[in-house]
């Protein structure tokens, strides 16, 4: 099932596109702008396919009822994964719908604070959490807290890109292990691959 999507020269497309993506500075923070994390400048199907196949290769999708992500950039990932695995997905939204059983949870990241709202999860659901980037861990902690309140069983957690200490923070605070496809940093205005 796993398809290798090489960019040429034997490198995987995700790593190649990360190394060449633009960097913008906001305050003291350097943001990398990448199709998987931002949807700009353009999301190529072969990149999305590669990322989905790599997630499927490392993930535990046996007996999973639902995939879970937070809006916005996890949406293309869970949509693609759902098409490959036939597992439905749930999106934690930034907007309240006031549906019965809706679970609000506070989210604090390096750049924003606010509420996320979980719908569509039932007690006992076996879920896999998917996200595009883990950096501070704030979004992931919010997702985990909401799923625990709903009574879901978290089978696996996979983020495409790891940056900073968020993975370690989430693992220490929640006890859940997080898998990532690539670890990066921004050094001298460029993305550096620390681990792939």
UniProtKB/Swiss-Prot annotation:
The keyword Transferase applies. Pfam families: Pribosyltran. This is Hypoxanthine/guanine phosphoribosyltransferase. It catalyses: IMP + diphosphate = hypoxanthine + 5-phospho-alpha-D-ribose 1-diphosphate; GMP + diphosphate = guanine + 5-phospho-alpha-D-ribose 1-diphosphate. Pathway: Purine metabolism; IMP biosynthesis via salvage pathway; IMP from hypoxanthine: step 1/1. It is an enzyme of class 2 (transferase). Homodimer. GO terms for molecular function: guanine phosphoribosyltransferase activity; hypoxanthine phosphoribosyltransferase activity. Its main location: cytoplasm. Catalyzes a salvage reaction resulting in the formation of IMP that is energically less costly than de novo synthesis. GO terms for cellular component: cytoplasm. Keywords: Cytoplasm, Glycosyltransferase, Purine salvage, Transferase. One of its GO terms (biological process) is IMP salvage. Its EC number is 2.4.2.8. The lineage of its organism: Archaea, Methanobacteriati, Methanobacteriota, Methanomada group, Methanococci. The gene is hpt. The keyword Transferase applies.
């Amino acid at each position: 099932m796993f398809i290798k999507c090489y960019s040429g020269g034997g490198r995987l497309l995700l790593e190649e596109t990360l190394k060449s993506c633009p960097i913008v500075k906001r305050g003291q923070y350097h943001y990398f702008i990448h199709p998987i994390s931002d949807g700009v400048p353009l999301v190529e199907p072969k990149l999305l396919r590669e990322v989905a196949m790599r997630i499927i290769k490392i993930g535990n999708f046996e007996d999973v009822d639902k995939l879970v992500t937070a809006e916005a950039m996890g949406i293309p990932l869970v949509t693609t994964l759902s098409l490959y695995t036939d597992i439905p997905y749930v999106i934690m939204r930034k907007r309240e719908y006031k549906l019965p059983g809706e679970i609000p949870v506070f989210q604090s990241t390096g750049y924003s604070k606010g509420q996320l709202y979980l719908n569509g999860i039932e007690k006992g659901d076996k879920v896999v959490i998917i996200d595009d980037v883990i950096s501070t861990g704030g979004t992931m902690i919010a997702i985990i807290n909401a799923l625990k309140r709903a009574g879901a069983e978290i089978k696996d957690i996979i983020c495409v890109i790891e940056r900073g200490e968020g993975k370690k923070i989430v693992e220490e605070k929640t006890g859940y292990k997080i898998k990532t496809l690539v670890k990066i940093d921004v050094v001298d205005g460029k993305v550096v691959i620390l681990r792939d």
